[in-house]
Amino acid sequence: MRVLFAAAECAPMVKVGGMGDVVASLPSALAKLGHDVRLIIPGYSKLWGLLDISKDPIYTAQTMGAEFSVYETKHPTSNLPIYLVGHPVFDPERIYGGEDEDWRFTFFASATAEFAWNVWKPQVLHCHDWHTGMIPVWMHQDPEISTVFTIHNLKYQGPWRWKLERMTWCPWYMSGDHTMAAAMLFADRVNAVSPTYSREIRTSEYGESLEGLLNYISGKLRGILNGIDLDEWDPATDKALPANFSSGKMSTRKKNKEALQRQMGLEVNNDKYLLGMVGRLVDQKGVDLLLQVSRRLLAYTDSQIVVLGTGDQILESALWELAIDHPGRFAVFLTYDDYLSRLIYAGSDAFLMPSRFEPCGISQLLAMRYGSIPIVRNVGGLVDTVIPHDPINKSGTGFCFDRFEPIDFYTALVRSWEAFRHRRSWKELQKRAMTQMYSWERSAMEYETMYKEVSGYKEPSPDAIEVEKFSVGQDADPSLKNEKLSVGQDEDSSLKNERFI
């Protein structure tokens, strides 16, 4: 089966969140099942220094009043074909943000649609998050191309309908308040990145005002758990680690803990309880909860805490204050570093993920793979992947709490600290966590089943009257009434992309 992945990220070259890992690893697993899988991403300027890219474009065309060129290259690890949409708008050293973000990704989606129609026609076009959300709308008119839309994070929903109409062609049949809503309505299948998250987003607590729409499309909504590349992330062979280890040979793991403590300026002592955190430093990840409980935890236990990541400046500053107030106990490194992240997974005793919401989460899978016990909130994909520790029955893989409250998180931390005192049972807990097999192969087979369901099939158009019931609406900003939301767009450019009308 011919499958084209369209996304804003692809690890390791372009990665901000978990989507980059999915777009890199899932196609490789699908290719091993015998499918012809290719990727298309924006041609970010930094890629020309990282990849061997064709000198001349393989396709040049116009859309949304601007010219684009498509270049071909290969993924550095999977060797799968990657197509890069080239345009000066992708030149700055950024992936997200900027005043032109809405235009930039809508342009990428439009260029991808033109490429799929005219150059390499897939049977399934797999779109990821709002950046590619208009593609299912346009492909709704093409019976030969089916679409799958994956929700990685429902919070980010793309430009509203009024803005889309001034940037690009919105077909007469299109409905939905914004890009994310339109994608969910017109994709032939929609999936969230874990079974629990697919249920949560149908509720008001996690639905981001889209719960009504998600219940309306529930018949085509799926939940498929993310995985990890077990070869790429293997503590027995990972060359980045000071000492390799496995579930059958744990004795050398302590060398990684000592190396981590030394590098982060902590007291080098294997008996200290070392907690790690890697990721975006934002409210979603529960960094504010960590800030509220850290001083008490450090005062009443012998714990050490290491934090790696970037994000909200207020949270970063608060973490710095903690590090200054607790030298040798609390360390923070405000950047992303692959080597250091691996060292935290391999050297920490436990891994912190007190998330407000978590579509799937990959960090907890990597932590378990490397023997760091996850301490998580029971939400989203964390529910599907972390089994609560039961010392009596000697089962479970981590520590879980329910409410997003400091006292609940603190209680889970103290429970884990007490469990760490019992070294023999703690090692058994580590071994159970390390032997969990959340590979992409299992997930790929579920995606394959979904592709077969939709190949050659188009979902009926949504009922516009029913959809209107779920509209939350947003009026156009009067100050933008005469603004042109494109690069070199003339007044009638929204008509230039019309097809099959």
From Swiss-Prot:
Region of interest (Disordered), residue spans: 476-501
Pathway named in the protein's UniProt entry: Glycan biosynthesis; glycogen biosynthesis
GO biological process: glycogen biosynthetic process
Keywords of the record: Glycogen biosynthesis, Glycosyltransferase, Transferase
Transcription is among the record's keywords: no
A Pfam family of this chain: Glyco_transf_5
Enzymatic reactions: [(1->4)-alpha-D-glucosyl](n) + ADP-alpha-D-glucose = [(1->4)-alpha-D-glucosyl](n+1) + ADP + H(+)
Annotated residues for binding of ADP-alpha-D-glucose: K15
Assigned EC number: 2.4.1.21
GO molecular function: alpha-1,4-glucan glucosyltransferase (ADP-glucose donor) activity; alpha-1,4-glucan glucosyltransferase (UDP-glucose donor) activity
Highest taxon, organism lineage: Bacteria
UniProt family annotation: Belongs to the glycosyltransferase 1 family. Bacterial/plant glycogen synthase subfamily.
PANTHER family: ALPHA AMYLASE DOMAIN-CONTAINING PROTEIN, GRANULE-BOUND STARCH SYNTHASE 1, CHLOROPLASTIC/AMYLOPLASTIC
Function: Synthesizes alpha-1,4-glucan chains using ADP-glucose.
The protein's name in its UniProt record: Glycogen synthase
Species of provenance: Prochlorococcus marinus (strain SARG / CCMP1375 / SS120)
